[in-house]
Amino acid sequence: MDKFVIRGGNPLIGTVRVSGAKNSALPCMAAAILTEDEVILENIPQVRDIETERKLLTSMGAEVELGYGRAQHRTTISCRVLSDPTAKYEIVKTMRASALVLGPLVARTGLARVSMPGGCAIGARPIDLHIKGLEQMGATIVYEHGYIEARAERLKGAQIHFDKITVTGTEDLMMAAVLAEGETVLENAAREPEVTDLAALLTAMGAQIEGAGTSEIRIQGVEKLHGARHRINPDRIEAGTFLIAGAITGGDLCVSHCNPAHLGAVIAKLEEAGVRIDVLGKDSLRVRSEGHLKPIDVSTEEYPGFPTDMQAQYMALATQAEGTTLVKENIFENRFMHVQELVRMGANIKTAGRIASVRGKTPLSAAAVMCSDLRASASLVLAALVANGESILDRVYNIDRGYEHIEEKLRGVGAQIKRLGNVFNDKREAAQISAS
């Protein structure tokens, strides 16, 4: 099992490039199910979840080509033949986004069998909002042997109100609705950039969608969709993670190939904390910090508020602020699993329910820590970058689910970080980073 060895203390200086958004790419790959034609997606990140989605689609009979190169990360998907509309447990057990094939499958084939999804263990992300919406559209749902089976001759348009804002639920039902008979209205819909990115692809495929990016989305169903070419949005969470990496290390970092418009809440909090951020053109940000950080409270919200996927990283930064920072998690319960690992590194953090109190400025010391989920893992990387000594991060496959070659990107801007695989016990490997 791979590990990271990180020696802290180096300011990050230089330019780091942001990859395509995993959380945009996954629903866009699922959208290829809706047509017999080829769908070409560009700016696909090279991360573990994308490979899992490829396996999922090919297990259904699709043809999926993934190509990675310096200039272009691209996938070509053909779902002309879907021989088995089943999302098998052995594939989807590691990825929550597998639920996104439910809507497209029942819309295109009239049948979907999807195992209850897996992914990060950060609280309840109920699929019941997907199910309720599909039932309103006329689908018959059966739960059997750990699978959700949905059937419908053709889905019917419906007015669907989400009791709770759900990104994957909005995406799943938007995909289901594009081939439904009549108009579907999604109320209290998610407004995230990943939703608008999916809507842009679906529109390019011939769908009729209005209001994506607002709380009410209207979809007029069509008989058939065609193929399209689409470029995936930059990953706003990866970009935000690098902004904090520059700030926490007291560096001077340019974060390129991002979309500053998608980072408003993150930028605002960092600037309040005393971090200097400059917009360089339409797709780059420069972050500078001299290490004097103010304690600024944060409360996670749905977009355009402060993203829950940046909460753990912000908490790592808060350990270096001069005072007490309150962090409130409003989206998911049980999303403080990184706290105990940060405490192992010397952080002074106390939790009560959904609120964490972070007292700084705390000198962090290197430790062996466990990566529990994707964003918690990112927070540990950030903490290790400023910790005194050499930290060892175990189970970094959680990082690989959503960050493309993060160790190579960080090493390129001055971090002392090395990936160790099964040869971890070889002292010569560990010594390489100690001597660098």
Swiss-Prot record:
Modified sites of kind 2-(S-cysteinyl)pyruvic acid O-phosphothioketal: C120
Alphabetized UniProt keyword annotations: Cell cycle, Cell division, Cell shape, Cell wall biogenesis/degradation, Cytoplasm, Peptidoglycan synthesis, Pyruvate, Transferase
Cysteines engaged in disulfide bonds, as pairs: none
Reactions it catalyzes: phosphoenolpyruvate + UDP-N-acetyl-alpha-D-glucosamine = UDP-N-acetyl-3-O-(1-carboxyvinyl)-alpha-D-glucosamine + phosphate
Protein location: Cytoplasm
Record: residues binding phosphoenolpyruvate: K22, N23
Superkingdom of the source species: Bacteria
Broad class of the protein's primary localization: cytoplasm
Binding site for UDP-N-acetyl-alpha-D-glucosamine: R96, R125, P126, I127, D128, L129, D309, I331
EC number of this enzyme: 2.5.1.7
EC primary class: transferase
Gene Ontology annotations for the cellular component aspect, listed alphabetically: cytoplasm
SUPFAM superfamilies: EPT/RTPC-like (SSF55205)
Active site residues per record: C120
Biological-process GO terms, alphabetical: cell division; cell wall organization; peptidoglycan biosynthetic process; regulation of cell shape; UDP-N-acetylgalactosamine biosynthetic process
Pathway participation: Cell wall biogenesis; peptidoglycan biosynthesis
Record's function text: Cell wall formation. Adds enolpyruvyl to UDP-N-acetylglucosamine.
Family label: Belongs to the EPSP synthase family. MurA subfamily.
Protein name in UniProt: UDP-N-acetylglucosamine 1-carboxyvinyltransferase
Species: Acidobacterium capsulatum (strain ATCC 51196 / DSM 11244 / BCRC 80197 / JCM 7670 / NBRC 15755 / NCIMB 13165 / 161)
Gene: murA
